[in-house]
């Protein structure tokens, strides 16, 4: 919602494509968890998607994931019962374990986010952007989509298959973002 406020108030003369929200922390965590599970290098994990909000309603998606450009088959129960909740709650786990947030992980994610925007990436990235109805998500909410970044600009991947088991979760995170937008609108001019 911070980016939505920025796009409405602070940066009205900038194109909405210049406003993005940080989902890289969640994306990095998802890649790390999967790499550990598969005993692979993080940099060899490709096409992980984080849909929606930077909250516990986010939808980590491995159904298009590859390792070194090869498709992988993962146990659906592990994805739904272990992986998704772990990514969704990882920030809380760190705070509970350490007694404070992981500022180093957040700083690293900010660096990675800016680096991807500046230099592009050959992999899909999770980037919160202002929706325009992609994947039947309501327009004008900051929603994390799979994107490809080249030359300082991003394009939302428009051909990602969403596994049917994730459909309801996408609606939950969308509804949360719609509610947040409505709360914020009360305070905007």
Predicted features by range, described:
Residues 1-6, 10-11:
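Single conserved hydrophobic/aromatic residue that forms the stacking wall/gate
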């Amino acid at each position: 919602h911070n980016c939505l406020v920025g796009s409405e108030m602070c940066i009205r003369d900038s194109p909405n494509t210049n406003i993005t929200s940080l989902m890289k922390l969640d994306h990095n965590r998802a890649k790390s968890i999967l790499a550990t599970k598969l005993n692979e290098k993080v940099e060899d994990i490709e096409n992980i998607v984080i849909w929606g909000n930077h909250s516990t309603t986010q939808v980590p998606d491995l159904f298009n994931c590859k390792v070194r450009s090869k498709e992988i088959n993962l146990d659906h129960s592990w994805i739904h019962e272990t992986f998704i909740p772990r990514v969704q709650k990882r920030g809380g786990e760190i705070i509970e374990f350490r007694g404070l947030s992981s500022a180093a992980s957040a700083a690293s994610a900010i660096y990675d986010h800016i680096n991807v925007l500046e230099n592009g990436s050959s992999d899909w990235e999770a980037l919160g952007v202002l929706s325009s109805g992609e994947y039947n998500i309501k327009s004008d909410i900051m929603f994390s989509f799979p994107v490809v970044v080249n030359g300082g600009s991003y394009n939302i991947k428009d051909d990602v298959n969403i596994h049917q088991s994730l459909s309801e979760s996408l609606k939950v995170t969308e509804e949360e973002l719609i509610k947040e937008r409505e709360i914020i609108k009360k305070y905007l001019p």
